[in-house]
Amino acid sequence: MKFMGANELREKYLSFFESKDHLRLQSFPLVPKNDKSLLLINAGMAPLKPYFTGLEEPPKRRITTCQKCIRTGDIENVGKTSRHGTFFEMLGNFSFGDYFKSEIIPWAWEFITETLGIPKDKLYVTIYLNDDEAYDIWTSKTDVDPSRIFRLGKDDNFWEIGVGPCGPCTEIHFDRGEGKVETVEEFLEASDADRIVEFWNLVFTQFDKDEEGNYNELAQKNIDTGMGLERIATIMQGVDNIFEIDTVKNILNKACELTNAKYGEDKDKDVSLRIITDHGKSVTFLICDGVQPSNEGRGYVLRRLLRRAARHGRLLGVKGIFLNEMVDAVVENYGEAYPELKEKADYIKKIIKLEEERFNETIDSGMDILMSYISEMEEKNEKVLSGAKAFKLYDTYGFPLELTQEILEEKGLELDIENFNKEMKEQRERARNARGESSYMGSEESPVNKVDASIVTEFDGYVNLELNSKVIVLGNNEEFKSELKEGEEGFLLTDKTPFYAEMGGQVGDRGNITSETGMAIVTDCKKNVGGKFVHYIKVIEGSLKEGQEVKLSVDASRRSNICKNHTATHMLHEALKEVLGDHVNQSGSYVDEERLRFDFTHFAALTEEELEKVELLVNEKIMTVSVVDTKEMSLDEARNSGATCLFDEKYAEKVRVVSVGDFSKELCGGTHVANSGEIGLFKIVSESGVAAGIRRIEAVTGISALKFMELKNNMLKEAASMLKCNEKDIAKRIAAQAHELKEKDKEIAELKAKLVQGAEDDILKDKVEINGVELVTAELKDVDGNSLRDLADKVRNKLNNGIVVLASDNGGKVNLVAMATKNSLANGVHCGKVIKEVAAVVGGGGGGRPDMAQAGGKNPENIAKALEKAKEVVELLVK
């Protein structure tokens, strides 16, 4: 066989199916759109589910893709084996009610044996036990040796998940060994031994399984095939694992270079290098597709992968930041197929660098705490770390659960995962109750998401805010209805509408719908999971009926304010690019009638000067009264014209480009003002950080901006009145008062210090002796942490062989400190252990070294009990 690189294989596959009249689609982003069942895209067909289910019409009945995928189910095996990985590419061709078995089987054989040139005597085919049709096609329409076809049962060659669409499949296998297998038993044995490997699965979706277990023929039969690019690359390159194929090997070589480790010489180092290679690739693609590190959802998947790779870098001796340098190797090997990697490389590097820096801080503190837990377990001869302690590490210190588990496993210890999950569940319940979760659009099973795919609503609301239409669907949360009556709430679809459905960060329109028999208010307009325009309504008079002619009227004043904010968002985006640099890209937005919110990529808080420049630039462009122009063009034309595209969006071939004079040009389907002058005024309300490398600006326009300025002005007047000065002197007056307060605080601190001075002699009067070790405890009032440490140090200096534990109620908060003489340590004294137990009594925590430790608490009423606890702990330590 001729050697073929992974990039060449990808192109050959897609070109082959293009020659069979398939539409080639670019890979969908890893973040699913309108699919709450998936965290990340994990299969080639996953983003095409709406086409298979009939919720959406496909752009063509024949489609081919190379879909990037992430799977983390076997993450614990990644690195330990040579075939597990979290990132992979799935080659696929799909038919939605077009061709079926008699076409795809010979095409598959043609591609494998002719295009790729794989020897026929190295191939085997499996089919479902009873699929005679597939057997007949294989033997009549290809020249496969019939003795190389094996029939297998449901577990191997039938695809189904519960009830619903399902069907048999045929799989194509490659034999890495010598000789021929003659029987099913020999075939299965060779497969189990990894001598024979499956590399292409052709699924024939031809049945609909009902609740009774009956398999009913589908009217529309589909084809869904999947061939892992990495798997076929191992075959075409004559290697036996994914880390040896050209693209991945190049990235692994980069990992070796950055860690100064050699691959193939040490088993443990090889594991670390494979983890860094795989995870470095995954995090690059995830960040490119808009995922940000966080503690939940897909953001946590990213954080987990990144931190796992960073830790294995440390195991290889890397001291500083290095993972961001892996991006170059990923871009070099995947940049031609995924050009967005090249465009976002600098941004990806910065996000990784920020997260790795953050992790280095986390891992240092977290490792200290975990190792102290492990030391305690070893002292007590315990083998299981409590779930509560692991959860505290995770929740309070940001230490990843998986890292805790890995380190425990390395030490031969276990984790009480059941109680960890219990703690996690309780925390999620608290969070859920706090935010009051709701699902506005209902579940995928609700009627609103079961509207027939053939129903189409024409949007005619860019200019028209009122038009006549016909009701084609009515319903509520439980069922479709022919009529909705006064007082009832539900949803309504029409054949055309002026109502904009929430999309691209812009909220949906509100308004009303009237007919001869009644009237309803439109509380919102959204698209369902199938992309249909859905009007959410409440009938306030009479009734609305299916099939009726109705008049739809958008709230014009509200729409006008939304348009001002949306156009201003585009102008803000461009202004940020001009002031901060081209690395600025939209990360999210929200536009309603009151304000706008814009999230963007940047790596530091904006200075006051930068904010002023951005605000001034937007207002200058508003004053030019530039025409806001919209044009439809092809995606390539839009890109070539310099229009800004969002990396995580999937665009159609025809796109809408919105331009504000010669200042801003973006792809956008939203509604806008006719000219920039309509915005009137733009005012930034706030600037903040929302994630690593992501900043957020909130702003107002028009009358809202004037009201905001008026509010600020009134606040200034009120402040001037309270300070008894002119508005222009407010800053000076505040600075003067701040200086006065600082001086008074200094005087108070000096007075407190004088009160504490000399107190050590009084404290020493209560000294007790425990097995030859002196113990001094005392409760004080209104002594800050620094003064308490100074006092403890003075008391310690007057001890021969002992420990002092002091506690202070300082404004309702407890300060604790323990100090011990060096010779007392030999008697078993350990301040860190003492203070930990003492702090728990006052509702706090802390720790430290054997000779000095400090902590805090929130229950000063328990200080006396805490000091009694100190005595108990010292008695145990110095037995």
From Swiss-Prot:
NCBIfam families: alaS. It catalyses: tRNA(Ala) + L-alanine + ATP = L-alanyl-tRNA(Ala) + AMP + diphosphate. Keywords: Aminoacyl-tRNA synthetase, ATP-binding, Cytoplasm, Ligase, Metal-binding, Nucleotide-binding, Protein biosynthesis, RNA-binding, tRNA-binding, Zinc. Belongs to the class-II aminoacyl-tRNA synthetase family. The gene is alaS. This is Alanine--tRNA ligase. It is found in: Cytoplasm. It comes from the Bacteria. It comes from Clostridium perfringens (strain ATCC 13124 / DSM 756 / JCM 1290 / NCIMB 6125 / NCTC 8237 / Type A). GO terms for biological process: alanyl-tRNA aminoacylation. One of its GO terms (molecular function) is ATP binding. Binds 1 zinc ion per subunit. Its EC number is 6.1.1.7. Transmembrane segments: none annotated. The keyword Transferase does not apply. GO terms for cellular component: cytosol. Catalyzes the attachment of alanine to tRNA(Ala) in a two-step reaction: alanine is first activated by ATP to form Ala-AMP and then transferred to the acceptor end of tRNA(Ala). Also edits incorrectly charged Ser-tRNA(Ala) and Gly-tRNA(Ala) via its editing domain. Zn(2+) binds at H566, H570, C668, H672. The keyword Transmembrane helix does not apply. InterPro entries: aa-tRNA-synth_II/BPL/LPL, Ala-tRNA-lgiase_IIc, Ala-tRNA-ligase_IIc_anticod-bd, Ala-tRNA-synth_IIc_core, Ala-tRNA-synth_IIc_N, Ala-tRNA_ligase, Ala_tRNA_ligase_euk/bac, DHHA1_dom. Its cofactor is Zn(2+). It holds the Pfam family DHHA1. Its main location: cytoplasm.
